[in-house]
Design a protein with these regions (language model features):
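Helix-coil boundary and interhelical linker segments in multi-pass alpha-helical membrane proteins
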Residues: 52-59, 113-128
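N-terminal topogenic module of multi-pass integral membrane proteins
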Residues: 2-93, 99-105
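Structural signature of hydrophobic alpha-helical transmembrane segments
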Residues: 65-69, 124-129
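Hydrophobic alpha-helical transmembrane segments of integral membrane proteins
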Residues: 97-120
Length: 129
């Protein structure tokens, strides 16, 4: 286990980072406009092979809400390791592992990849998932 002094500094750092990420998430959502990007799918219409397709819209996704969710997940992760899971977090750090951060990265990076794909023009549901 890290020393009590190191554990205290890590807790303080995680609480600070979590607070900043939470404030960022709230600000992004509060200042958001109604900008959203579509999610669509193309289905064959008619006989296979003739090249006739029907475009179906599944709705749209708010870019600001995606970015806000990204920051909110980071805040939750920081608060989790600073609070209820701190002992487990410190024990894992002592073994040079950080599974909480990897879980947060897995979730938040998926959201960010989705958002970046949409911003660059990808709207097909098959490509987005």
């Amino acid at each position: 286990m890290p020393s009590p002094d190191v554990a205290k500094r890590l807790r303080s750092l995680n609480l600070t980072a979590g607070s900043l990420h939470l404030v960022s998430a709230i600000a992004i959502v509060a200042l958001a406009n109604n900008f959203s990007l579509p999610v669509v799918a193309r289905y064959e219409a008619g006989q296979p092979g003739i090249g006739k397709f029907q475009l179906v819209s599944y709705g749209s996704v708010s870019t600001a809400l995606l970015v806000g969710l990204f920051f909110a997940l980071s805040a939750i992760a920081h608060f989790t390791v600073a609070g209820p899971r701190q002992a487990s977090y410190l024990a894992n750090l002592d073994q040079r592992r950080n599974p909480y951060r990897w879980l947060e990265y897995a979730l938040s990076s998926s959201i960010m990849i989705f958002a970046i794909a949409q911003i660059t023009g990808v709207s097909d549901v098959a490509a987005l998932i």
